[in-house]
Amino acid sequence: MTELTHLFKPGRLGRYPTRNMIKYGACCVSNYNTRDGFITPRELARVRVIAGTGCGIITNQGAYPDPKGEGKSYFRQVALYDDKFLPQFETIARYIHDAGSVAIQQILHAGRYGGIDLGYCVQPSVVPQTLPHFRPPREMSKDDIRRCIREHVEAAKRAIKAGFDGVEVTSFMGYLLASFNSKFTNQRTDEYGGSLENRGRFMRELIDGVKQALPEHPLIVRLNGAELMDQWGGNTEDECFELMEQAARAGVDQISVTVGWQEAPESSIGRDIAPGHWNYLATRAKKTCPGTQIAFGNRLPDPDMANDCIGRGEFDVWEVCRPLLADPQLIHKAAEGRLDEVRRCIGSLNCLSRLFRDLPYSCTMNPALGHEVEPEYAITPAAVKKKIMVIGAGPAGMEYAITAAKRGHAVTVYEKGERIGGNLYAFAAHDLARPEDLMSVVRHYEVMAKKLGVEMKFNTEANAKLMRSVLHQYDVCVVASGARIDMEAYAGIDGRERLLDALDVAHGRVQAGKRVVVIGGGKIGLVLAESLRKNGAEVTLVERDKRIAGDVMPTFKWRHTTWVEELGIPVHTSARLKRVTAEGAFIVDGKGKETLLPADSVIAAGPRKANQELFTEFEWMVDELHGCGDALMPRGMDAAIHGGYRLGVRI
Amino acid sequence: MVAGWQSVLDRHAELFSEIEEEASLAIVPRRFVAPVCDPVPMLLWVREPDGMAARTGQFGGFKALSSDLLLIANDGTLEQALSGNEPLAEIKRQLRAGGMLFMVLRRKDELREHGWEDFLEWLGMPFLGACR
């Protein structure tokens, strides 16, 4: 049983008792719905999983409140400006109540980031966008402001009519409420702009409007503890907390403390931010607004840590979302003392990378997310229990192995190395952000393999000889042998025998010198170059393409380019290797100019080639032969995990 | 100052090679930036037939500005950038450090049509944001 007594003590939100101090935060719009704002079966199936997470309070994702769609920020965001949307909201409220939780509906008017289907967005003042993704601004008139408040109130009433217990208005990340509060975007000279009191007027009128209409129902506001926009003329932290006081005085039932704007020059929730980094903002909110419940969860993915914070009185409610995308059973596992089984959110922000390309969100760690409506993605008992051999203990092989084992198959994994993880292990060892996040993937597979009885055979190379030795013992063979650096791609290069293989260097099988040239500015080359440079080597990066980081997750590209600059790694783009000598690497740029890059080690970090030879070798030696992950097509960890899972639920 | 930036633009011609003729980027000191203001001198990077040209112009507020992009600099930041070895890299650094601010005066599709994609990508603008 749990020792997380603070997290699992009963609580209260307004007049509603809650079974614990955990709130499912509406951190992400799913983009699973129709273009005109109706909730789809896909969304309903997803929300059913959310309802089952065990959180005491569950917030349904933000709906835009206006018929014009000025508040709409995401391609397939849900709407709440008309009763025609209510039937599906009623279903969602019922799911949440059936699961024993308090149901909150978020109202999300994106303001500066809205108007996705329009040619403009609305703001308190015309302050041009700083990110090209968003629409050019129009200033709201006083009539617009009054109408906007009315639309929020009507949307709130509609949510209650659908069966929700309360509503939340979000100013997260620079949405409309935030842009009224901030002096960066609010440069009005009327009663809605200027002083902090005036800038907070929109928020107070909004709170007052909703509270007057729905006095019996809890109202939550999400407010920035830090905008991270102060260098550009935004609010200071002191101003953010004064606005929180205004909200508390206006009678909100809970303040959810958030961090940062979309366009802030710093990151706030990615892998490079240490868990607990922003806790001081929650602590300050609690001190500033002692009579108001404070919810917090930014970059606080760990239930143990959240439990301790609540115990110390730093905040009242742990607001969590992304960790529950990665593992919807997180709360139940925490309650049952099974935290070692949790599949951790690794902060890759695949979810957001996809949202900003108008795609439905997905999760690196949870391949079933967004596919709950499809029975094909469910783990069900296998009709025929099989003996299965898996070649390779990287993410694809292990994901397949544990999925198959959950279905009742007997699984044995053959791994030529001495541990689980494959190239991910080497990648994590050199990662400058937070190696612990990537290592948590490896640890998860280690724990689950043990618990599920997956047999691991390390230091065992899979080849025809091995296969002959186990002939007819297995029904299925899954080749998840990963990918390698394609050294044959350098066949025409003089001195190619001097090249080092990036994976050999990353795994520590080969030592690089003190002056290094890395050929290939994709993620393998970047991670290795950054790590070698950080450890004191002089490193130069050479990339054929116009830009580096072509295969890196969009939300992490900036991080690599910044590291490369900060570490002082010279980069030669649109350049290719011509020859390697004892002096170093000779490269040729796009104009044909040859340059010597002095080096004692020249490392080939690309291109990659799938390890597919075993498919041919094993073709006539086993009943079923399948493949997954980089062995099919070198892509990356997400594709490997998702591919392993999809094969696992199918065979 | 103009000659200095011209030399920088010439050195990085490949970043601006796709930009449409007459498309421009304006650079203005932060203290002057307002929707409308009395005309003050500004620096312009304008695409001409032979490449990107550095020029001076008059800034009367961003409402009337015909440029696609506006770079706002704290006092001294631009001069500091120009005096270093890599002025464009310094601009990129200052954008992240808060010494400069970038404003987008056209829609994304218009910027793409005008050929700014390479430059914006190089600056890392599509990937900025705290939500990461």
Walk through the language-model features, giving the residues of each:
Chain B
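Feature captures hydrophobic
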Residues: 1-132
